[in-house]
Amino acid sequence: MKEFWVWVEPFDRKIVSVALEAGANAVVIPEKGRVEEVKKVGRITVIAPDGDLKLGEDVVYVLIKGKEDEERAAKYPPNVKVIVETTDWTVIPLENLIAQREELYAVVKNAQEAEVALQTLEKGVKGVVLKSRDINEIKKVGQIVSEHEEKLELVTIKITKILPLGLGDRVCVDTISLLHRGEGMLVGNSSGGMFLVHAETEENPYVAARPFRVNAGAVHMYIRVPNNRTKYLCELKAGDKVMVYDYKGRGRVTYVGRAKVERRPMLLIEGRYENKKLSCILQNAETIRLTKPDGTPISVSELKEGDEVLGYVEEAGRHFGMKVEETIIEK
């Protein structure tokens, strides 16, 4: 996920507060002795000579004036985060640096520059560092960064089998965000084939809507989390990051507020996309819904063979939640 840092020089408590409210991941403070003042404002990563991340060690700043500086920025060890700045990105193309290293953060002066930095070479920089004391600009950049989240190509899965099972343990994921119609989480028996399980945004005569919730399914299943990784549903706990996707494949990060494991009657659902078979095990209840290609939810109690729902397919296998190229057969 993209990161948003705010450069605070000279130190200004109000700018730190605005950065925190705008969703900044960190503040960069070149001055020593300000860490405690920042922590009084709120919990945020401080990048400073005496900060959570040490400026000059964990994070380095490079002013790019020519090819020599560009080469120096590219040569830092992979674990070092590099902040780069230049007076004119049209003279020193950002593409060159993005192609050479992952942990790259570009200094920007406004929202327009942030937009360009995040989109360069499709993948863009790891994050932007805003050098501006304009409160509105800080808020604008925060909004832009939050919108530049993961985008997946969702596929249409044709349902081939629906089989009621006995009781099993399922995980209900309550997030700290309100989800909308057409949004949900990607889960599946295999990380290579997942279904978009819809959030509980719909009301019915018996149960009120719970738009913060996704009843995600059986404890053994995979769920997609940030940075192209997966977790088992049973691993989720309060404070964990999870991905929420809409029916167009646009992803955003939210956090688990509570993960409830309860014993419930379960349902095996199988489907096919081209020559690939996918499956998931969900609770057998009217409130559990998958997502149609147009974004409307469909209850598992109404689902039938031949229906089409949304999902995601990838070819690589997983090793400790990370994508790897290897042969894995899951049945």
Swiss-Prot record:
Family assignment from sequence similarity: Belongs to the archaeal-type DHQ synthase family.
Keyword presence, NAD: yes
Upper taxonomic lineage: Bacteria, Pseudomonadati, Aquificota, Aquificia, Aquificales
One MF annotation (Gene Ontology) recorded for this entry: 3-dehydroquinate synthase activity
Keywords, comma-separated and alphabetical: Amino-acid biosynthesis, Aromatic amino acid biosynthesis, NAD, Oxidoreductase
GO terms (BP aspect): amino acid biosynthetic process; aromatic amino acid family biosynthetic process
The enzyme's E.C. designation: 1.4.1.-
Pfam families: DHQS (PF01959)
Enzyme class: oxidoreductase
Domain of life according to the entry: Bacteria
HAMAP family: Arch_DHQ_synthase
Database matches in InterPro entries: DHQ_synth
Record protein name field: 3-dehydroquinate synthase homolog
